[in-house]
Design a protein with these regions (language model features):
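Hydrophobic, aromatic-enriched interface-forming segments
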Residues: 121-153
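Helix-turn-helix
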Residues: 24, 32-74
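Short Lys/Arg-rich basic patches
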Residues: 9-15, 21
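C-terminal peripheral helix-coil segments that are non-catalytic and often amphipathic
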Residues: 1-9, 109, 113-124, 150-179, ...
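Amphipathic alpha-helical linker/stalk segments
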Residues: 71-106
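Short, leucine-enriched amphipathic alpha-helices that occur as contiguous helical runs
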Residues: 18, 22-30
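A short secondary-structure junction motif
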Residues: 78, 82, 86, 135, ...
């Protein structure tokens, strides 16, 4: 999408009137795409939800594919505002060769940002959740996945896997490190993709700020326990390998010492 199609902020602050209309269309489109999918959503329905005439969509986005792309870009922009600080912090602690407790805290900060984005940001989370669900099902245009992967998932997964690798003594591309990262993030996933089931089980009607903090505290504690355990296991394995390596050298050293002593004894006898 060319720059003329992007939101433009005036120097005085806020959005120009045309950009307000564009934003309304995007929010309406996220809702429509989430409910009906790309094929089921119509430009007429999107225009009606946004309170504009159908030709306005063509003016701002050219076609329905352009609207869909703009929705993915909008979600990526809004999400990155939440994730950029924790991703930057994680990259810094990794480059500073920080100790394990600092690395664990950095990973937990990423999880908390994910939870905030899922539950606590007042920017149409329900509609965006449906949009995400359809995109993940693989039946929607691939452009959304490409945008969200490049701008959100890849940066998050990169620092997340590097943190896990450093904490647990593996490599970032090791399947074990990736499985551990995904399983830790998966603690939040059930509440995001199956809210009806989880809320009914808990007797909740929604996840407000207080309940969101309870979720974060629970996940934070569980994540810390697991990361500390995996770190300790890795340290113990290193020590065990070091002892084994050291132990294997002792018999060789003793054998060499015996041979040296024998040679000295033989030499002494010959001199006599």
């Amino acid at each position: 999408m060319n720059d003329t199609k992007r939101l433009r902020r005036p120097s005085a602050g806020g959005y120009v009137r045309g950009d307000e209309t564009r934003l309304r269309i995007i929010e309406a489109a996220i809702e429509s795409f989430g409910e009906h999918g790309f094929e089921g959503a119509s430009t007429r329905d999107i225009a009606a939800r946004a309170g504009v005439n159908a030709p306005a969509l063509q003016y701002y986005f050219e076609n329905k594919e352009g609207v869909y792309r703009a929705c993915a870009e909008y979600i990526a922009d809004a999400s990155w505002e939440t994730f950029e600080p924790v991703v930057t912090h994680a990259a810094e602690v990794l480059s500073n060769d920080s100790d394990t407790p600092v690395l664990i805290d950095a990973f937990i900060r990423i999880q908390e940002a994910i939870a905030d984005r899922m539950f606590l940001k007042a920017c149409g989370p329900t509609n965006q959740r449906l949009f995400f669900a359809r995109e993940q099902a693989g039946h929607e245009p691939s452009i959304a996945s490409e945008i969200l992967t490049r701008r959100l998932r890849q940066p998050l997964n990169d620092v997340g896997s590097r943190l896990i690798a450093r904490i647990t003594g593996t490599k970032p591309d090791d399947p074990l490190a990736l499985i551990r990262m995904l399983s830790l993030h998966g603690q939040l996933l059930m509440f995001h993709v199956a809210p009806r089931t989880t809320l009914a089980l808990l007797g909740w009607t929604e996840i407000d700020a207080e309940k969101g903090e309870l979720l974060k505290a629970t996940v934070r504690a569980q994540t810390r326990i697991l990361l500390e355990q995996w770190s300790n296991e890795a340290s113990n394995e290193v020590l065990a390998n070091a002892r084994e390596s050291s132990g294997s050298k002792k018999p060789v050293a003793r054998a060499v010492a015996k041979k040296t002593a024998a040679r000295k004894s033989t030499t002494a006898s010959a001199k006599k």
